[in-house]
Amino acid sequence: HGTSANIRYKYKLTNQIAGKTGTTQNQSDGWFMGVTPNLVTGVWVGAEDRSVHFRSLGLGGGAHMALPIWATYMQKVYADKSLGVTQDDFEKPAKELSVEVDCAKYEKENKKNNKDIFKEGL
């Protein structure tokens, strides 16, 4: 659920949705990327002038300024049946997926190739 919980509770979008919020450090840009089984869309809110920003993360975070636009957009997309965007679940992979997660292996390889970047003891 995380920062996108309002998609379910406030906007009543109960189908399977993956999403990611983002915010710049000075709250001048916020975005939300939403992924459904048959549509991927993103919303960015910001200004070209970097001095334009919200005073706090509570107001200027992607979950507060971009997610509401995305959720309202998706409500309208789902309401317009002529678009053919359904509220289906994600398709389960036919076979189990495996992903190697051995960060130490890659860190050692990077240290060999980039000795000047890594300093021992840090």
Predicted regions and their residues:
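A penicillin-recognizing enzyme superfamily signal
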Residues: 1-106, 119
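Short, low-complexity, Pro/Ser/Thr/Gly-rich segments in the mature regions of secreted, periplasmic
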Residues: 111-122
